[in-house]
Each structure stands twice: as C-alpha cells, then as structure tokens.
C-alpha cells in the first residue's frame, strides 16, 4: 500500500485506462486535474500545514480571498463524485482512506474497477463483481454525503449536475464539510462559482496549475426543508436535499411532461436532433419489442409507448441520471412499466417503458428486438468524438432480429450512412434538415 495519496497517484496514473469507454492516444484516464484535486485536499500534509493557499474568485483575478484552514485533519473517509476512471478513488484507497464514490457513467465505474485490478488493489473477476478494498460505490443521494467532512469532485460539464450535487452536499454533509472541486481550466466557467454559492457561503478558486484549477466550497447555507419528497437518481425516495430535482417541464409540441436530473442530456427539454426523429416517428414500424438506446430523459421511448400502448419498450442508458430521468418521464406520462439495473428482456415484462442502466446493449440478447431508436452521443466526458456511434451501431445489429430496424438521427456532417450500411444493413433516408439526418437501417 502506498504511504501517501500523491505516491499512489504517480504510480497508478500511467497504468490506468479508460476501457470499456472510448480509448485513443489523445484520451487519457488520469490527468493533471485529478492530481491537483488530490493535492489540494491536503491529505498528505502534516496537520499543522493544512491550510488553504491564497486564492482568487474565478473570473475575478484581482479579488483576494483570505487564508482559511481546511477540514482535512483526522479525515478517515472521503466522498468522491464524478471520478472519471478511478484516478481519485483508487489513490485514496491505496493510502488507507475509506472512499464513498459516485460515478454517473457505467463505463467509468467499470473502468475504475478494472483499473483497481491493473494497479494491484483488487483481484480479477467479472467486472461488476470486482471488489476494491476501501471503496464503496453509492447512488447520488443524501446518504452518500451524510456526515461527510471532505468531498472531492471532478466538476461536471452540466451546471444542472453541479447544482444537484451541491444541494445534496449542503443538506446532508457535516456543517464543517469542505468541498474541493476541480477540472481543466478550458472547461470551467464563472457560473460554476455561482452554482456552488447557492448552497455554500464561502466559495473560492485557487490559482491555476498545469492548465487545471480547483474551486473550494465550505460553510453550507441553512438547510431548506422540502415540501415533498421526490425520487432521487438512485430511483429511491430522496431525503431532503434534492429540492429542485428532477426538474419538470411540459413540451407543447409533443404534449410530453419531461423530467430531468441535473446530469441528463438536454435537461427537461427536447434537443433538436431528437425533435426531428420525433417528427417522423409515426412512420416507424408497429413493433412489440422496442429499445431506446442512449435514452437520456426517455423522450423517444415514452413517445413510442404512448402511440403503441401494447409495446414493450426498454429505455437504456449508461447514465444513472438518465435512467432516473427516463423513469420519472415515463411515470409522468402514464406509460411506466418498471425500472432498475437488471433489465427485462424485450421478450418479456409488462407493456410500457422500463428504464435500465446498461453499457450500450450489453445486457440484451441477440436478435431480441424489433425496433431500436438511437440518437448517438458524440461526447465522452468533455471530449468530442465520433468513436462512440460505431460501437452502438454494432450492438444494435446484434440485438435486432432479422428484418428489424434501427431508426437513427445523426449530425449530417458525420456521414454515418456507410457505417450503418456496413454494420446493420440496407439504409434509407427518412428525412433531413440543414443539420440532422434520420435514417432507417434494416437488419
């Protein structure tokens, strides 16, 4: 076991990978922001030296923030949120800390478990069965932060996600909690300070180091008691804290009530690509076994289920927030069949929408679906990449029965049609506008 967090990070980082997420020479599993977050927590420093450096409000470089002590003395456990591939949690565990970690993406959680094996912290096993001593994965809810005195966080891309996380910390952590949240400077904005300041009286920004920077938050504002409990991203009833999540909006064009947790793509709205696919969804086959792959808030799944009440629709996404959002959206529109991490087969289960967490279609049987709906993502974390869609096309081809169809909307400049032809089968264009194309591919 490493004697310090820094030593563990330096030893582990070169051996860590992103798999099963997209891998490439320009995409890394651990970077300077991970290192800075760990160093800024002060866990390796003697207690007498644990104090905040002079810092400046992000976006206001002339404002001087006085020094203040951190809360890292005698810390035995650390809460980690947004760890991408284990670069935060694993060094902490190696240095002897107990770590509670929440990772929204299933690919990131699996990568962290595999990386624990690679660096010698865990024994090889089926990926979801790998046990990492000292590390416990947890849903994003009040229990994750209950009594916490130190929270480390990779800043999320979405301000909504940051708002939801900050609210839960402020309402459930120890009043003396300190939050150290970091990222690459190019992905940070002054609005992140504002999101934290809604819930914490003290928010500061350290000087940038290696193109990375950390924000610090402390002194939670007074707790606000909710008027009613709402489902949290885990699907369980939320304790006070997620006071404004999920957010709900009514979309006039579709007639849908859309529910969204903070990290859900497009929030409680409908992105323009999905809206184009919705405009021609009535031309899709009348199918009994349907999958909305990469479902987000479940708009496609719910729309199809409303038009086809006897259909069994699986809404699948690797994001915890997306699955919780899709479940809430299905319930709000009266078409929910169930939810959870163990999906029904499209061949069984009740009619309606079942939202499940899965990496692509890994849990689905070969030749089991009649119709798959897909709006493929092109972001892996903060990175823009076209490498995600081909894997989804291949998985869709495996899961579709002969004669089944993949209806896909994609940015026209990406020119996915040849890949769809090669992976799935004969592909025809359904509609195209200046930005997006909708195609149907027959298996």
Name the predicted role of every residue range.
Residues 406-443:
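C-terminal catalytic and target-recognition region of SAM-dependent MTase-like enzymes
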Residues 173-174, 400-402:
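Helix-to-beta-strand junctions that scaffold the AdoMet/dcAdoMet cofactor pocket
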Residues 150-160, 293-301, 369-382, 396:
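Conserved proline-anchored active-site loop of SAM-dependent methyltransferases
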């Amino acid at each position: 076991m490493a004697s310090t967090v820094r030593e563990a990070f330096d030893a582990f980082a070169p051996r860590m990978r992103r798999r099963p997420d997209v891998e490439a020479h320009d995409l890394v599993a651990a970077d300077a922001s991970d290192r800075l977050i760990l160093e800024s927590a002060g866990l390796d420093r003697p207690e007498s030296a644990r104090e905040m450096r002079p810092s400046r409000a992000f976006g206001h470089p002339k404002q001087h923030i006085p020094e203040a002590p951190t809360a890292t003395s005698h810390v035995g456990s650390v809460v980690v949120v947004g760890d991408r591939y284990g670069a935060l949690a694993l060094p902490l565990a190696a240095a002897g800390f107990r770590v509670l970690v929440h990772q929204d993406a299933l690919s990131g959680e699996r990568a962290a478990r595999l990386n624990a094996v690679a660096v010698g912290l865990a024994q090889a096993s089926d990926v979801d069965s790998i046990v990492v001593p000292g590390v416990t994965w947890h849903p994003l809810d009040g229990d994750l932060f209950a009594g916490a005195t130190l929270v480390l966080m990779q800043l999320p891309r979405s301000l909504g996600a940051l708002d939801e996380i900050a609210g839960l910390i402020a309402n459930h952590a120890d009043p003396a909690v300190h939050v150290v949240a970091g990222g690459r400077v190019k992905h940070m904005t002054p609005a992140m300070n504002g999101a934290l300041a809604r819930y914490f009286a003290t928010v500061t920004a350290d000087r940038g180091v290696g193109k990375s920077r950390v924000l610090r938050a402390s002194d939670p504002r007074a707790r606000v008691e909710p008027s009613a409990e709402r489902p949290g991203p885990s699907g369980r009833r939320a304790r006070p804290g997620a006071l404004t999540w999920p957010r709900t909006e009514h979309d006039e064009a579709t007639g849908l009530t859309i529910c969204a947790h903070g990290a859900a793509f497009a929030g409680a709205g409908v992105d323009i690509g999905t809206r184009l696919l919705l405009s021609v969804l009535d031309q899709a086959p009348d199918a009994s076994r349907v999958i909305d792959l990469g479902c987000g808030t479940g708009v496609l799944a719910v729309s199809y289920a409303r038009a086809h009440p006897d259909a069994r629709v699986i809404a699948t996404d690797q994001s915890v927030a997306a699955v919780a959002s899709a479940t809430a959206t299905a319930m709000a529109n009266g078409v929910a069949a169930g939810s959870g991490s163990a999906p029904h087969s499209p061949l069984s289960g009740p009619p309606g929408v079942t939202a499940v967490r899965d990496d692509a279609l890994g849990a689905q049987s070969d030749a089991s679906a009649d119709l798959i709906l897909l709006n493929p993502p092109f972001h892996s974390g903060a990175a823009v990449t076209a490498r995600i869609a081909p894997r989804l096309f291949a998985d869709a081809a495996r899961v579709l029965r002969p004669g089944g169809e993949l209806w896909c909307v994609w940015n026209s400049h990406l020119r996915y049609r040849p890949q769809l032809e090669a992976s799935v089968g004969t592909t025809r264009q359904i509609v195209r506008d200046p930005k997006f194309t909708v195609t149907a591919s027959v298996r």
